Amino acid sequence: MMAAALGPPEVIAQLENAAKVLMAPPSMVSNEQRQHAEHIFLSFRKSKSPFAVCRHILETSKVDYVLFQAATAIMEAVVREWVLLEKGSIESLRTFLLTYVLQRPNLQKYVREQILLAVAVIVKRGSLDKSIDCKSIFHEVSQLISSGNPTVQTLACSILTALLSEFSSSSKTSNIGLSMEFHGNCKRVFQEEDLRQIFMLTVGVLQEFSRRENLSAQMSSVFQRYLALANQVLSWNFLPPKLGRHYIAMFESSQNVLLKPTESWREALLDSRVMELFFTVHRKIREDSDMAQDSLQCLAQLASLHGPIFPDEGSQVDYLAHFIEGLLNTINGIEIEDSEAVGISSIISNLITVFPRNVLTAIPSELFSSFVNCLTHLTCSFGRSAALEEVLDKDDMVYMEAYDKLLESWLTLVRDDKHFHKGFFTQHAVQVFNSYIQCHLAAPDGTRNLTANGVASREEEEISELQEDDRDQFSDQLASVGMLGRIAAEHCMPLLTSLLEERVTRLHGQLQRHQQQFLASPGSSTIDNKMLDDLYEDIHWLILVTGYLLADDTQGETPLIPPEIMEYSIKHSSEVDINTTLQILGSPGEKASSIPGYSRTDSVIRLLSAVLRVSEVESRAIRADLTHLLSPQMGKDIVWFLKRWAKTYLLVDEKLYDQISLPLSTAFGADTEGSQWIIGYLLQKVISNLSVWSSEQDLANDTVQLLVTLVERRERANLVIQCENWWNLAKQFASRSPPLNFLSSPVQRTLMKALVLGGFAHMDTETKQQYWTEVLQPLQQRFLRVINQENFQQMCQQEEVKQEITATLEALCGIAEATQIDNVAILFNFLMDFLNNCIGLMEVYKNTPETVNLIIEVFVEVAHKQICYLGESKAMHLYEACLTLLQVYSKNNLGRQRIDVTAEEEQYQDLLLIMELLTNLLSKEFIDFSDTDEVFRGHEPGQAAGRSVSAADVVLYGVNLILPLMSQDLLKFPTLCNQYYKLITFICEIFPEKIPQLPEDLFKSLMYSLELGMTSMSSEVCQLCLEALTPLAEQCAKAQETDSPLFLATRHFLKLVFDMLVLQKHNTEMTTAAGEAFYTLVCLHQAEYSELVETLLSSQQDPVIYQRLADAFNKLTASSTPPALDRKQKMAFLKSLEEFMANVGGLLCVK
């Protein structure tokens, strides 16, 4: 258009003026001028056959931005008009562009890159119909390389990089309006031949450079460019031969690409000289940190080589042996640079995880032994450097990252007992374990806080305040070190025991000295805490390692004593004196070594006893009023350890083990004095902590978690309730007396949960009645006393009244959290009385959001924990209560505007909680353990004959309430958005028959929400909406009402899903959900489906594509019978759809 109307000089003048406008500061030009300038460039790029004008621009214009746009116009027009262009003119255009760049070494980088990209696109488009191949380009590039001119060699590298980027993945390709299938096919063709050619050219350059002695700065820069190119080739994500476009997208999104080339690469990569070259290159440039990153990444990729490239196992063994030799030659005897640590650990990690273990063990044994020794040496060395980074509080923790990788590699090796005999890694494990302990202990035993020159580091306090808890931050490291400790239990357990016992003695001595000093001169406060701080930090790390060594983190599984620990205890049981062992366990106040025959104790029990001795010193210091000298961190470590230990060892269940250690079963088995004693001891610890440390929230929380562990298993709870302390704790908490009433809300909630769980231990009826009277009744009485006061309305905002109400609501949440199938009957009836009163509180506190939220949260917890056990009549009571709650909430929120878009998500906590409540009520339809009120036998059985309220009523009423409030602004909050869509999907799945009966406004809002979720939200939300469509379409098919709003809405959704599957890119995971919805919608709207297919086919200009699409659609619905809602037919359709997506999915999805 534009080019035809004006001559080249005028076009250039117009473009240069437009460029000036675009480059001008915002204050100098108006929006209209800017838009007009943009429009000029857009229409220029769309003009027909702009090649001559573009050549003229490139040769005459001096404005970089205009040159850039000319290159872009050429690239887009070549693809657009490909079929109309002569092969010769395409070839001359490509030659012109290359020559142009060659002759102008001073071009701006972004202009040069864009011109080379145009060349790459021409080559790519030509590769498909074989009209242009890369050979001529490679010939030209190899001539440029051999010129010896650094500028020209750099240009050659830029050409190869442009080709590589264009072909490498669909995410990096230019947006040139071609199908994803086309991009995938080009990549496959390219990776077989041309990619290898680029690699060989690159290897040639690297060989040439590695032979040279001295490189000028310019030559080094060229060397670096080619090394980066080699890295790009070796990090290529090789596409398997057949892969649909969705799978291509998923395949290419994987982060850590391992090297898996095709067979055609054997000669290039299995040639030992190639591997040697990369080791040589690294040795040459290792002191240049930027280049070292690339050379190590190349080696890490070569260390991950796998797949069809290896003809047999023998070739794999040879390759691996050769690689390990090269690696050892490179790193033995050198001081590793900081910039090499992560790269070297990646190489080792890849070798250990990618090569099968039988290949690893097949290399010469001496070589394997040297490799493991090297791994041991590096792990210890990186561990020391990582500890140093911690001390210096560095931002870039390279050694920590490298150390983590190596510890993971150890875990892979030591867990494999098929290929390595027992004890194979023991000595190495000892070295790594020792070095870890050494790095975490203060001098003189360890090197913690010593900088490289042996000087103590800056104050520890500054650092520890800023960081998350070590047990979370370093959990992976601790798990690996704990595992290595088990492998070498013979060494590690006695070591930990002696280190802990020795520090307990020193801590006891230090605290005594402080006490004497204080008694001698009460006013003096010249206490040097340095020694105490060092001791606390030592004990902190020793307890963490001990916890990870003795027990595993078990989530949702039955915790078992690790087999290595059990075997170790059994192996030495003949040398153990049980009575002495029990004496050491039962006298934590005495020094272990002062007990006669102390050396004949079980090592596992002795190690636990060492931690109990730490705990005892803490308790004695508290009794001696030295709490101010204690470390809350140590208190946390102790209860964390005791909880972890108790879950696994306390009342050990012999049925779970093939063989059991006699000392462990005697000390901690059922019906033993040892277990009764330790439960009493732990309970005392809990009570003491809650009194002394009530203001330390984390410590109090860890303490109540230990209490829950003691009562969550019935067998342990039976022992707990025999302790008088337990009853005292229950009474104290129920009376809300200090210091328990100072505990934070979450801690009080968990404490209530523990007290309720304890109440279901085995007791006679009278005792149980007495227990509930002391634990639950005071809660009820105090609550009723407060709310039934005549002037409650006036007093409700007083601080002590609000505190009482809050404490009661928190306690109710705790009671609900304690629900189990065998206690739900009692707890439900108890809680229902409260729920009705809570609704009244909603009125009183309607302007106090935090109280309103807490009231709703009580309902959320009750529904979440109990609904699945409730029979019909009980469930109805809960539904009625929830409905009343929603009605009150609705009345109080009428007309309340939520317009503050900048508000934080917390301000919408009430909406979130209501949605959670509705979702929990719906879950009854999925998970129902009730047996028509069977669990309530004897608890007012009550019939539901005159059912008045159903879950559907409550939930739809709730949705009616929520929908008008859920603006698009609110949906920007991810948690709100996900909870909202989860809820509406549930409703469509469970009550599809209720959807057509919704009021018109509500129905429209719901349909709009589904469309919004499918088109504008995350893939997770889109999937939920697709899952909602299937039941809605099925409902329509059942109702057979072709004029209903739902029928019309599903017709609209058919087009949306059709477009999504056929025309748009989307995640593979969604294909199944989309496919199911699509099938149901096609069954419902067969004529409309045929129309959509016809429209799509008639818009195709290319006869080949037309035919392929027509055949694919025919095959998709090939069945002679029309599609019907039949499971067998549906499954056949989904299978055909998968084939359809693989064959033509990429044809219409363009980029």
From Swiss-Prot:
Q: What's one GO BP annotation on this UniProt entry?
A: protein transport
What result is annotated for mutating residue 470 to N/R? Abolished binding to and nuclear export of hypusinated EIF5A
Q: Explain what the record says happens when changing residue 465 to R.
A: Abolished binding to hypusinated EIF5A
| Compartments, as annotated in UniProt | Cytoplasm; Nucleus
> Any idea which UniProt keywords this protein has?
Cytoplasm, Nucleus, Phosphoprotein, Protein transport, Transport
Q: Does the keyword Nucleus apply?
A: yes
- Residues bearing Phosphoserine are 464, 521
Is Protein transport given among the entry's keywords? yes
Where is it found, in Gene Ontology cellular component terms? cytoplasm; nucleus
In terms of InterPro entries, this protein maps to:
ARM-like (IPR011989), ARM-type_fold (IPR016024), XPO1_C_dom (IPR014877), XPO4/7-like (IPR044189)
- Purpose of the protein: Mediates the nuclear export of proteins (cargos), such as EIF5A, SMAD3 and isoform M2 of PKM (PKM2). In the nucleus binds cooperatively to its cargo and to the GTPase Ran in its active GTP-bound form. Docking of this trimeric complex to the nuclear pore complex (NPC) is mediated through binding to nucleoporins. Upon transit of a nuclear export complex into the cytoplasm, disassembling of the complex and hydrolysis of Ran-GTP to Ran-GDP (induced by RANBP1 and RANGAP1, respectively) cause release of the cargo from the export receptor.
Q: What family is reported?
A: Belongs to the exportin family.
Q: What is this protein called?
A: Exportin-4
- Species: Mus musculus
Q: Which gene encodes it?
A: Xpo4
